[in-house]
Amino acid sequence: MTTKKLTLRQKILVAGTLFGMFFGAGNLIFPVHLGQMAGQNALPAIIGFIITAVGIPILGVAAIGVTHSDGLQTLSGKVGKGYGIFFTCLLYLTIGPLFAIPRCATVSFTTGITPLLGADSPERLYLLLFSAVFFAFVLFFSLRPGKITVWIGKIINPLFLFFFAVLMLAALLAPGAAVSAVEPVEAYRSDAFFPALIEGYGTMDAIAGLAFGIVVIDVIRRMGVDNDDAIAEDVLSSGLLTGALMALIYVVSIVVGAQSRGLFELSENGGIALTQIAGHYLGGVGLFILAFTITFACLKTSIGLVTACAETFSKMTNGKISYRSWAILFTVFSFAVSNIGLSAIIEYSIPMLMLIYPPAIALILLAFLGKFFAHDRTVYIATMIGTWAAAIFDCMKTLPAPVQTALHLDAPIAFAAAHLPLFDKNLGWLLPAVIGFAAGMAIRASRRQTPASF
């Protein structure tokens, strides 16, 4: 019996779905800013960024299919039922009201409103007013899901990509400086690969892939593919198409960001950099189109995230707290967080991402290695113990200095720096994760040994 697989046309359609899930206008702020920081060391920065911003997210989606899971809670539940609930909540809050949703509003404000304000304008007040209107629309459409997100997806997203292509082409044809002539900032001078690897965390796409992988799998199933192995294979092959497009966009963005240093000083964040580049090459009309398309693209992303988070938490509470209540709560909370500003949101998100990304990556890798240990829970638990224990130190290290001082974290951070390999690269969790995995495999092997007969 022949197992049905997707045709090339169907794979392209799935790739489009994946691209729509992963790539939002907010993603562009990271590669452009990365290019400005990396300068002449753009190549190793590109490689590092693509690993965590493209490769891991695609594997995250495929992990749901490989393990035949029906969602993130089922996959993370292989560690334990309680852990599955905990990790699902933490992940959705991170890509929801804590960081990703507020970031959408602030990216729109930074690229659309800030360039219009005078030097003495009360920016905080305008951010408050803008975010109030932005989240009023988010709540309205989250409570009344309909064709608005389809309209934005079919019209605004392609318009944005077209505009972005024109902007990037204009920048590449008339670069502000040669990439080789741009001095990198201190953090990227001696080693650009590892900082860029961590910079890719900011896209939050790896954890988003775990959260929304089931959506893509359902799309494939509706196309008539019902074999789990075939589904996983189709996700991977479609993901390669998506990854190639995302990688191309990121490479161009990083190069243009580096070249822009010949025109501008290092910007505070990528939103400001993108606005400066658009204004220089395309003038006032370019700024207007950038603001219009990014605002609507971020609006669509916010509506989708509020909807996904509200549905997930409503299901987890068995409907005792309604979808409507969760949607209102998440929208109001996101509105409040958005008013700390884009740079602050990015800064405060780093410690959380340093905490949640290591176990997310470990979970993805365990999903693919699971066939070698029959997805034994012991291996999952042992790996996660090592990963979480070390990730906590990585999180401590990236907390703002006043917080480190207030919590007296100097001693534990110094301990980790002395005993964890790669801790200086923000990858101190790698060796403990490997040790945990090895310990889990050893425990499993010892359990399988048959006692000798006498």
Language model region names:
Residues 174, 376, 380-454:
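A generic transmembrane alpha-helix motif of multi-pass inner-membrane proteins
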Residues 97, 101, 161-188, 206-207, ...:
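Hydrophobic alpha-helical segments and their helix-loop junctions in multi-pass secondary transporters
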Residues 71-77, 249-299, 306, 351:
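TM-loop-TM module centered on a large, flexible mid-protein loop between adjacent transmembrane helices
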Residues 144-155, 193-196, 216-245, 263-275, ...:
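Hydrophobic, small-residue-rich membrane helices and short re-entrant helix-turn-helix hairpins
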Residues 13-23, 170-177, 186-253, 286-301, ...:
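Hydrophobic, membrane-embedded alpha-helices of multi-pass small-molecule transporters
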Residues 66-74, 134-156, 222-225, 335-348, ...:
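Membrane-water interface regions at transmembrane-helix termini and the short interhelical loops
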